[in-house]
Amino acid sequence: MKRISIISPAYNEEDNVEACYQAVADLFAPGAPLEHYEREHIFADNASEDSTATILRRLAESDPCVKVILNARNFGPFRSNFNALRYATGDAVVVFLPADLQDPPEVIPEMVKHWENGIEVVAGLRANREETLMLRTFRRIFYRLSNSLSNFEIPENVGEFQLIDRKVWEVVISHTDHYPYIRGIIASTGFKRLILPYTWKARKRGISKNNALALIDQALNGIFSFTTVPLRLCSFLGFIIAFFAFLYAVFTIIMTLFDASAAPAGIQTMITAIFFFAGVQLAFIGLLGEYVTAIHAQ
């Protein structure tokens, strides 16, 4: 019997973890779409401050299909989820099913169906999002910027709610990033992928733990994890600034030869030196970044 592993991160989700557990268990019950598959449900608690950990312990004691990872502190959503991913033993793995059930578990049987037909990555796409206009706009800007800078495409509104084959899982967990951007890692593997649209639901219980600063942090991590364009742009701008500073120095010398009183003594030299050395510093910062990137890639 094939096994399906499902990863559910949680942080202060005492109102949702039991509902998440039951929703997944119902998919594998007799007569349900996944009755012929073995279930492995891994909860990763990110040092919750409420009774989430207590509830998860009780679920694990009563159901051998449930595994629980209790983090010693809050490591953030990406690191916590990636750590839990390492413990998956299934033939296919649902990378991210958050306990708040905004990503609907009822989509998983269709994901499994496509996987059985040879698709190695079934990526859920949030075709409809029950969220504010500001958040939608922010996400749209992020995806367009990220895709314009990276060497591969992450479809807009595709998150970590994806089902991946075991061989994709092996490639993904081989990454040793300190702060892994999971959807980017999966997209970079290049395996056969299918996009599956679904409606991302509004949260029914509790409040979201993702504030504006957390979203910005995740966006910056996504942008800088898979592209060297900002570093090269830094070098390019540095050389450009230094070049124009040099031209200005030549222009200043020529003007001084014709009219020594064109500006107070030393002003042109100071302006030229400031811009020239600022440009040189910026260029070498970019070059240093290129070397660090090369070391990281090795």
Question: Model-derived features: where do they sit?
Answer:
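Acceptor/aglycone-binding surface of glycosyltransferases and processive sugar-polymer synthases
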Residues: 71-87, 102-184, 201-220
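Short, well-formed alpha-helical segments that are part of the catalytic scaffolds
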Residues: 13-32
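Conserved donor nucleotide-binding strand/loop of the catalytic core
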Residues: 32, 39-42, 53-82, 86-87
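Acidic helix N-cap motif at the loop->helix transition within catalytic regions
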Residues: 15-19, 50-59
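Short beta-strand-to-loop acidic/aromatic patch adjacent to the donor-nucleotide binding site
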Residues: 91-102
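A conserved acidic beta->alpha catalytic loop
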Residues: 45-54, 101-102
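Cell-envelope/extracellular polymer assembly enzymes that use nucleotide-activated donors
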Residues: 3-5, 40
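Hydrophobic helical membrane-anchoring modules
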Residues: 1-3, 181-298
